[in-house]
UniProtKB/Swiss-Prot annotation:
NCBIfam families assigned to the protein according to its UniProt record, in alphabetical order: PRK00136.1
Quaternary data: Part of the 30S ribosomal subunit. Contacts proteins S5 and S12.
Family: Belongs to the universal ribosomal protein uS8 family.
Biological role: One of the primary rRNA binding proteins, it binds directly to 16S rRNA central domain where it helps coordinate assembly of the platform of the 30S subunit.
Gene that encodes the chain: rpsH
GO molecular function, one term: rRNA binding
Regions annotated as coiled coil: none
InterPro entries: Ribosomal_uS8, Ribosomal_uS8_CS, Ribosomal_uS8_sf
Gene3D superfamilies recorded: 3.30.1370.30, 3.30.1490.10
Lineage: Bacteria, Bacillati, Mycoplasmatota, Mycoplasmoidales, Mycoplasmoidaceae
Protein name, UniProt field: Small ribosomal subunit protein uS8
GO biological process: translation
Length: 141
């Protein structure tokens, strides 16, 4: 699929992704398009693996300046989104790092924390198993 219109770049790409997910969830949109990056794609893969999103697709832009990624939110038969909330934790002005012993439980284990580690982006559960700490990017429930 080729896209003509490029979304605006944002200062904090991770914040932009979570804002788009939250807005799409509230507006009950099915698909969302944003500028692609390796970090965004890694986050989307985690959300798909955990069952929060249906799929994603990397799109080519006509001007070929920036790649785009389009992802599909997952809904139940009653049009209830599988994502109830997203909260960004680490921000450009205040990075939050934790060791694996101090990684938070989101809603007593019902949600996930997305962690950026030296081994890549992963959930808090995987980081605890690997005994790796890192930067807490966001909570998803």
């Amino acid at each position: 699929m080729i896209i003509n219109k490029v979304p605006k770049a944002h200062f904090d790409p991770v914040s932009d992704l979570f804002t788009k997910i939250n807005n799409a969830r509230k507006a009950k949109l099915l698909t969302v398009t944003t500028i692609a990056s390796k970090l965004k794609i890694a986050i989307l893969e985690i959300l798909i693996k955990e069952g929060y999103l249906a799929n994603y697709q990397v799109l080519e832009n006509k001007t070929k300046t920036k790649k785009l990624v389009s992802f599909t939110l997952k809904y139940t038969q009653r049009r209830i989104c599988s994502i109830n909330g997203v909260k960004q934790i680490s921000k450009p002005g205040l990075r939050i790092y934790r060791s694996f012993e101090k990684l938070p439980l989101v809603l007593n284990g019902l949600g996930i924390a997305i962690i950026s580690t030296s081994d890549g982006v992963m959930t808090d559960k995987v980081a605890r198993l690997k005994k790796i700490g890192g930067e807490i990017l966001a909570y998803v429930w």
